[in-house]
Amino acid sequence: MIFPAIDLRAGQSVRLYQGDFKQATLINPDPVVQAQQINAAGLQQLHMVDLDGAKSGRPENFATITAIRQAFTGTIELGGGIRTYELATRYLELGIDRLILGSVALTDPRLVKRLLSEFGGERIVIGLDGTNGYVAIKGWLEQSQTKMSTLMKTMTTSGAKHFIVTDVARDGTMQGPNLALYQELQAQVPTANLIASGGVRNLTDVQVLQASGFKDVIIGKALAEGGVTLAELAGVTEC
């Protein structure tokens, strides 16, 4: 599946460079319109992140997320600051299809295990973000001492099936995806489904990832800068 990305900051769609909040580029002042454009192109998946929430641990763009959920007819996965059971269930009740749990997978694994047990591995997805193989947390503002592979194995034991893997150093850079990282993690946990995120430049990158076995790909900056079009991505999903 192809997941166009919308990252929310102060109610607008932006892109960060290597997760740096000081290096934000405005993509669309009205992310609802952006979501509708994705739908209109024939794409039925949307990856969304509350960047402000990722920093604060609170729902900072709830009204915008609600409006996008009402406007977008397909599947929405959402991450960013989901660190309590109450917020997780609030988003699920809103109609969000899949929740992405990042920092909390490291800081509160019992909560993640509870959510996985209650809602299942199809609705609870683990966001595995890292630098040099180590997990980054709290909106990528902190780097932990835990290896990405270690956390992945722990979460698999807890019932996780899907992992969105992002090399922070590649995110928003248009330098190409870190295929070697995906292959290394996949080799360590063969049963997991890895969703590639970060660095995708064009349609060729998508095709290389899929040919390598990584069928699910998230695309953000390449869409904003014209490296790939929604129409091209819609064609990929039809193959």
Curated annotation (Swiss-Prot):
Q: Which reaction does it catalyse?
A: 1-(5-phospho-beta-D-ribosyl)-5-[(5-phospho-beta-D-ribosylamino)methylideneamino]imidazole-4-carboxamide = 5-[(5-phospho-1-deoxy-D-ribulos-1-ylimino)methylamino]-1-(5-phospho-beta-D-ribosyl)imidazole-4-carboxamide
**Biological process according to GO:** L-histidine biosynthetic process; L-tryptophan biosynthetic process
Q: Which UniProt keywords apply?
A: Amino-acid biosynthesis, Cytoplasm, Histidine biosynthesis, Isomerase
Pathway per its UniProt entry is: Amino-acid biosynthesis; L-histidine biosynthesis; L-histidine from 5-phospho-alpha-D-ribose 1-diphosphate: step 4/9
Q: Which top-level group of life is the source organism from? A: Bacteria
Claim: Amino-acid biosynthesis is one of the keywords in the record:
yes
Q: What is the lineage of its organism?
A: Bacteria, Bacillati, Bacillota, Bacilli, Lactobacillales
Positions annotated as active site in the UniProt record = 7 (proton acceptor), 129 (proton donor)
> Where does it reside?
Cytoplasm
Membership in a protein family: Belongs to the HisA/HisF family.
Q: Tell me what this protein is called.
A: 1-(5-phosphoribosyl)-5-[(5-phosphoribosylamino)methylideneamino] imidazole-4-carboxamide isomerase
Cited InterPro entries:
Aldolase_TIM, His_biosynth, HisA_bact_arch, Isoase_HisA-like, Isoase_HisA-like_bact, RibuloseP-bd_barrel
What EC number is given for this enzyme?
Answer: 5.3.1.16
Recall the GO molecular function terms of this protein's record.
1-(5-phosphoribosyl)-5-[(5-phosphoribosylamino)methylideneamino]imidazole-4-carboxamide isomerase activity
Give one Pfam hit by family name: His_biosynth
Gene name as annotated: hisA
- Quote a single Gene Ontology cellular component term: cytoplasm
| Primary enzyme class | isomerase
